[in-house]
Amino acid sequence: MTVTEQEFLASYPQKVAPGGPTGYPGNLTAEQEQKLGELKMILLTKGYEDRTDDATLLRFLRARKFDVPLAQEMWENCEKWRKEFGTNTILEDFWYKEKKEVAKLYPQYYHKTDKDGRPVYVENVGKVNIHEMYKITTQERMLRNLVWEYESFVRHRLPACSRVVGHLIETSCTILDLKGVSLSSASQVYGFLKDASNIGQNYYPERMGKFYLINAPFGFSTVFSVIKRFLDPVTVSKIHVYGSNYKEKLLAQVPAYNLPIKFGGQSSSKIGVELSDDGPWRDPQFVGPEGLAPVAGERPTGAPSIVSNSSTYAKSTASTKVGADDKATDAKANGNGAAAAAAGAGTAAAGGAAAAAGASSSKQAAPAQAAPAQAAKAPVPAAAKTATAPAPTGKTAAPQTNSFPPEMLAMMEQNEKKAEKAAEAKTKGGAAPQANAFTDEQLAQLNSLPQQVATGGVSQPLPDSHVTQGVPTVAKIAEAAAGPHEDAHLPH
């Protein structure tokens, strides 16, 4: 069964719960209504039909503080990226069959809902073993899987959650477990997290409802207290940082029967919470015309459940893309890197494509230059250019990179060395030197760092993304890890 996007949107609530902040569907000021109408008219006049519903346009407007030209540019850049990446059909044509093996090395999963009805998303950065992961997958396929998850989140999880509570649910509750994070583990996954964050910020804005960083290393809060001054206050109010004493705080937001046992809850699964994908999106009474959510790691059917309102909707090319995925993954498993790159050309550009500014051009990427027949048959989507959206002309926002200058990285590295010495001294029974504590001079340096330390020069407040706003920021702060933990709750 297939339905149009319009029929799909009509199948679940399109207004938020009453009494919340303005700027959301069903709760707009007169000025916000006018801005929404203005943006919608511009896009419809230009021939756009899909994703011009109120909820979608309002997310882009909120991300750009209701500046219509900036929101328009951000939205149009997103549409270009979607076309180039093949996002509209990714649920039907991408097969991440190495999912189970990757999950053992980098746990990322959804599990039930919080007390406000949001899907709960969990990620364990400290458990990452990037070297082992890249024996069975590639960064490009990991990013494609990330987009697959985003699309399943939007098309299946959020609608089901909205039907449960009777009003629109647009965001997630994220738990980022930093247990085990160290300088080496953070730097291993930094490249992936940076590209993942860029995708979330630029193409899935305003998807973060609550964000919990748990098992935060000592020293993390000190740096974050500086960083947060440069972030949008609305975003900061959603972020909560805790050390090892987080259980009570998590249980205040997530019911015990929904929170995994490892975090102090009561929820478990026979196949493991990392793979179960339990939630309303698996309950037939809350599943609408979109059908049951696809299962990550299973071969896609190739049949879309939701089609475009317009006649220009990109048709599914499942047979071609799934075949290319098979060859790429099999070749990777056999250690044949060249064959994997060639066979995977139909789904991801190799090498540093993630660092290219893909959203800045509607041109397709050049075909792979390899001789293998697979590469010649499967065009390389400009899709894999996942990094950053271009800065809007005239007014302002630079690409969102969230990187740190050498001075801060040096301080963090020195800090970690102190922690190692402290641990060594404690083991030997001697007097432990002060670990993971910034000196007054270092704190002064942190406080004097310019705004681009936190934002990479972005003059607009950074938008929320569903995984996290500025994951690279978190990853770099986490480089101060290795010592005792401390609790620090960011005030609302």
Swiss-Prot record:
- Mention one GO biological process in which this protein takes part, according to its record: post-Golgi vesicle-mediated transport
CDD domains per UniProt: SEC14
Q: Does the keyword Metal-binding apply?
A: no
Keywords, ordered alphabetically: Golgi apparatus, Membrane, Protein transport, Transport
Q: Enumerate composition-biased segments (Low complexity).
A: 377-398
**Pfam families listed in its UniProt record:** CRAL_TRIO (PF00650), CRAL_TRIO_N (PF03765)
**Can the keyword Protein transport be found in this entry's annotation?**
yes
Query: Per its UniProt record, what SMART domains does this chain match?
Result: CRAL_TRIO_N, SEC14
Q: Which Gene3D superfamilies match?
A: CRAL-TRIO lipid binding domain, N-terminal domain of phosphatidylinositol transfer protein sec14p
> What does the UniProt entry say about where the protein is found?
Golgi apparatus membrane
Q: How does the entry describe its membrane topology? A: Peripheral membrane protein
Segments traversing the membrane? none
- List the disulfide bonds in this chain: none
Domain CRAL-TRIO: start-end pairs = 98-271
Q: Which InterPro entries match?
A: CRAL-TRIO_dom (IPR001251), CRAL-TRIO_dom_sf (IPR036865), CRAL/TRIO_N_dom (IPR011074), CRAL/TRIO_N_dom_sf (IPR036273), PI/PC_transfer (IPR051026)
GO terms of molecular function:
phosphatidylinositol transfer activity
Note down the stretches annotated as region Disordered. Answer: 274-310, 377-403, 454-492
A GO CC term attached to the entry: Golgi membrane
- Please describe what this protein does: Required for transport of secretory proteins from the Golgi complex. Catalyzes the transfer of phosphatidylinositol and phosphatidylcholine between membranes in vitro.
> Which PANTHER family does the entry mention?
CRAL-TRIO DOMAIN-CONTAINING PROTEIN YKL091C-RELATED
**Identification of the protein by name:** SEC14 cytosolic factor
List the source organism.
Yarrowia lipolytica (strain CLIB 122 / E 150) (Yeast)
UniProt gene name: SEC14
